[in-house]
Amino acid sequence: MAGKKKSKSEALPLDLDNIKPMDHLQPVPKTRSSSITSIESADEPGTMKQVLLPPTIKEFDELEQFESFVRDETWDNDFDYFHGRLHYYPPFVMKSCQNNLEKIKPTMNKNSKKFRRDLQHHIQKHLIKDLEKCCGYELNFGKGEVVETDNKVTWKFKDETDHGFSKEEEDMYDRHWRLELDVSCTNESAMVDVEYKSIPM
């Protein structure tokens, strides 16, 4: 398509081994002001207060696209204000079916102990570590919490730490943020859903 602007992710392929970490924080981008709106205060009816609108949700169906999005948000100085969703078959699923989706066993879902073990390994040893490289700062999710229903299991992680920056530096630029990572699968398929949010505090 002529004249189509390429996104940074298309222009710069993802290379997890050569992403430079963030050394220092910077001021909040000026474009953020367009995301601030006024609403009536629930505490004091008749008065208005300013709130930051939630970031636009970006949807992905490939892990590399999702990781490139996270990397690009850091490069754009929006590392503390984004929301991405990923719907994908994890690498261990693709390997087991030799990249042929028709060969995915119907038993590969949340009811399979092996599938859950492989998914938990993928989350801890690959997904979180790769996201940390893409973010360019420390992620401190810990073990997380597992929430299970009859048809779904979700691993929930939160990071409200300083992400490796000093409190003085965070205060200087007013850059305090928390991260939320939810990874879930169902009893219907091997498809995994990831929801990753960076929220200013």
Curated annotation (Swiss-Prot):
Residues 31-40 have a biased composition (Polar residues). The keyword Membrane applies. It is a peripheral membrane protein. Pfam families: RGI1 (PF10843). Its main location: membrane. Induction: Expression is under the control of RAS1. Up-regulated during colonization of the cecum and invasion of host tissue. Down-regulation correlates with clinical development of fluconazole resistance. Residues 1-45 are annotated as: Disordered. Keywords: Cell membrane, Membrane. GO terms for biological process: energy reserve metabolic process. GO terms for cellular component: plasma membrane. It is found in: Cell membrane. Belongs to the RGI1 family. Involved in the control of energetic metabolism and significantly contribute to cell fitness, especially under respiratory growth conditions. This is Respiratory growth induced protein 1.
